[in-house]
Amino acid sequence: MTKTLAEQPGEGAAPVSPSPSRRALLHGAAGLGALAAGAAVAGPGLAFAAPAGLPLPPATPGITPFKIAVPQSALTDLKRRLGATRWPERETVEDWSQGVPLAKLQGLVEYWRTRYDWRRAEATLNRFPNYRTQLDGLGIHFLHARSKHENALPILLTHGWPGSVIEFLKLIPLLTDPTAHGGKAEDAFHVILPSLPGFGFSDKPTQKGWNMARIAKAWAELMQRLGYTHWVAQGGDWGAGVTTALAHLQPAGLAGIHLNFPLVFPEKLPTTDLSPEEQRALAQAQAFNTHGSGYFLLQTTRPQTVGYALADSPSGQAAWIYEKFQGWTDNKGDPESALSQDEMLDNISLYWLTDTAASSARIYWENAGSNFSGGKLDLPVGVSVFPRELFRAPKRWAEQTYSKLIYWNEPDRGGHFAAFEQPALFAHELRECFRQLRAK
């Protein structure tokens, strides 16, 4: 996910110029993010399968426990589809510049078909308390893991695209039980981890309007409903946008936020006397707009069209996400050096089994033209900039946007999926950032 590296382009947007303006830079980076076969719907001489997806229980304003249980028929159908994949010819280059190499995807798909075990992932998810509740008319899924330690600080974590709650599963025990993982009891957190609307086990919006600001309002209501009166929030990718919108909303009890994808730019881009960090940031933005924004433009302008292809082909869905694990993680050339095949397939399988290719892509369309940073922010903000992040904002730019920048660090490893790639390091960043915001 996340937004563009400036304002998002509309239809017919002009190509990025060699000397990018702030508008052009900002404009390419947001993503700098069947089940039971249904009854056929008869048409004139045609029959179409009903939309796939898990049958989710209706949500109510109450907090309802939820257990994940994918029907076996969905897993059988997945393996059948994987075995029937129609492959294109191989790429004409020896790298990833044309997309996922054929041999790499075939290897991942064969592992998915013959060796991968969704039930293991399902059991891991169910190890934590899962719930659903209705927020602004939509059923929202969330994990809520409370710490055993007194005075633990509630933290609201928000994922992005193509991520999910699965990104944070290794992080949860590090936050809730720090004494078991080299930390101190006073560093404990209660973890609240929702699935964005249209993602995972949350409902899919049936009407437009679910942009970052609306999601932020729903998250504020969730924290109030859970009874928290002093809490913090964290996000990367689209989660950074939602968390920033939450900070601008300043709901009761929100003490501060942490971001690992601060998409901030100065009001006026300087043309001379750029620091090395500023030169690097501008080069990153231009490179993304030129070489890495194809998915972003598609999902910003035609999420429904993309959805038809991905909803019908698990191999296509895998390629769409696997490519991002290669390009956006701190790896040695192959994504498997940053994340295991099982870890990547846990996330890919969640998208496939919940049939959320189109609904998750719509977050780009919903936020076209939005200001990702939302302007000046007065709430306390902490930032961790990981070395293989899509865009590494200079501290000077962050200071111009965040008047209360309470924490800034640039760890030595990790990428866009930092919590997934480096959970222990990510936990350390959160402990350090929020230590000063804990209730006395």
Swiss-Prot record:
Its EC number is 3.3.2.10. Residues 1-21 are annotated as: Disordered. InterPro entries: AB_hydrolase_fold, Epox_hydrolase-like, Epoxide_hydro_N, Epoxide_hydrolase, TAT_signal. One of its GO terms (biological process) is epoxide metabolic process. Pfam families: EHN. The keyword RNA-binding does not apply. GO terms for molecular function: epoxide hydrolase activity. It catalyses: an epoxide + H2O = an ethanediol. It comes from the Bacteria. Predicted to be exported by the Tat system. The position of the signal peptide cleavage has not been experimentally proven. Residues 1-49 form the signal peptide. Coiled coil: none annotated. The keyword Transferase does not apply. Gene3D superfamilies: alpha/beta hydrolase. Keywords: Aromatic hydrocarbons catabolism, Hydrolase, Signal. Belongs to the peptidase S33 family. PANTHER family: EPOXIDE HYDROLASE, EPOXIDE HYDROLASE 1-RELATED. This is Putative epoxide hydrolase. The lineage of its organism: Bacteria, Pseudomonadati, Myxococcota, Myxococcia, Myxococcales.
